Structures are given as structure tokens and as C-alpha cells.
């Protein structure tokens, strides 16, 4: 039998070797994993894991969403954070001088039947957690049931607009 002291030394040496091997293999694995970068087609801009494009040809809200759906997982843009709102605003500002609104993927399929504007949703089914209304969407002033970005807010805030109106729009899709 090996003395207790020798057995402890061998155990520590074996453990140290195993830890070294796992650490080296882990470093090699990390080097092989490419950093996530979104490469978008010409005319589109990347933000996080999506591609975005401002389409200047005015369409109704429904026609605009159909145009966006021609791309993989494409829809009118859903804006899920303040950072994304700023990105979309920078994409639009200075390029739509003749329009007071542009389409985004918000719509109210209940046509205002839900109290307090509770029927609004994104066309791509993203969860509507981030809210950035330029006023009250349930007011009786406009009563549109499709969402837009408003020029008066620097294209940062949302308004409601008549779905049959024709406006430029922003598409968002995964590449």
C-alpha cells in the first residue's frame, strides 16, 4: 500500500493536470466560436440580430406588412426598447421630409374595442412590453387602428393612423 502522503500528492497532481487540460480546451473552444454579427443585404442596416430598411414607396399598413414579409421572418418593425427606438429614428430622420408619419408594426385588430387601448399588438407577435405613445391611442381624436412613428416626436414616439392611409414604412427581419 502507498503511504497516505504519497496518495494525496498524486491526487493533487492529477487534479491539477485535469484542470489545466479543461482550461486549455475551454480557451480553444472560445477562440473557435465566431462573434455574432449580423450581415444585412445592401440597403438594409443592422441593429443587434436584425436587419432594417426604410421603404419610401407609400403603402397602406396591410400592403406594407406584406412587402416586409417577403424577407425571412420579416414584418413591419416592432420596437421593443428605447435603444431600438433611437436606432429606428436615426434610420428615418432626414429622409421622409414630406410625411408626418411612417408605418410600424403596431395595430389594433380589436378596432378599439378593448378598454384603454388594450387591443394593440405587434404584427410579428412580439410581446408589447415597451410603450412609447405620443399621446393616448384610445382617444377619439384620430381613432386610427394602425401604428406609426410621428415626425413631431423626431420619429421616436408612436401614433395611431388610419390603416388605409399610404405611408412610407420600416421593415425588420432576421438575416
UniProtKB/Swiss-Prot annotation:
SMART domains for the chain: CLECT
UniProt note on tissues of expression: Small intestine and pancreas.
PROSITE patterns: C_TYPE_LECTIN_1 (PS00615), C_TYPE_LECTIN_2 (PS50041)
Alphabetical UniProt keywords: Acute phase, Antimicrobial, Disulfide bond, Inflammatory response, Lectin, Metal-binding, Secreted, Signal, Zinc
Positions with a binding annotation for Zn(2+): 50, 107, 121, 145
Inducing stimuli: IL17A induces its expression in primary keratinocytes and skin wounds.
GO terms for biological process, alphabetical: acute-phase response; negative regulation of keratinocyte differentiation; positive regulation of keratinocyte proliferation; positive regulation of wound healing
Prosegment residue ranges: 27-37
Disulfide pattern: 40-51, 68-171, 146-163
Location in or out of the cell: Secreted
Protein name (Swiss-Prot/TrEMBL): Regenerating islet-derived protein 3-alpha
Native organism: Mus musculus (Mouse)
GN (gene name): Reg3a
Amino acid at each position: 500500500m502507498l503511504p497516505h502522503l504519497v496518495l494525496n500528492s498524486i491526487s493533487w497532481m492529477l487534479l491539477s493536470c485535469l484542470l489545466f487540460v479543461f482550461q486549455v480546451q475551454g480557451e480553444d473552444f472560445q477562440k473557435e466560436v465566431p462573434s455574432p454579427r449580423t450581415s444585412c443585404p445592401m440597403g438594409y442596416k443592422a441593429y443587434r440580430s436584425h436587419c432594417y430598411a426604410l421603404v419610401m414607396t407609400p403603402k397602406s399598413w396591410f400592403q406594407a406588412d406584406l412587402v416586409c414579409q417577403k424577407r425571412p421572418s420579416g414584418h413591419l418593425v416592432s420596437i421593443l426598447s428605447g435603444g431600438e427606438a433611437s436606432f429606428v429614428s436615426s434610420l428615418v430622420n432626414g429622409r421622409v421630409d414630406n410625411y408626418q408619419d411612417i408605418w410600424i408594426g403596431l395595430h389594433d385588430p380589436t378596432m378599439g374595442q378593448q378598454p384603454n387601448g388594450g387591443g394593440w399588438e405587434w404584427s410579428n407577435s412580439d410581446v408589447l412590453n415597451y410603450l412609447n405613445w405620443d399621446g393616448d391611442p384610445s382617444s377619439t381624436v384620430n381613432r386610427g387602428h394602425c401604428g406609426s412613428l410621428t415626425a413631431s416626436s423626431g420619429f421616436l414616439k408612436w401614433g395611431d393612423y388610419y390603416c388605409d392611409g399610404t405611408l412610407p414604412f420600416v421593415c425588420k427581419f432576421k438575416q
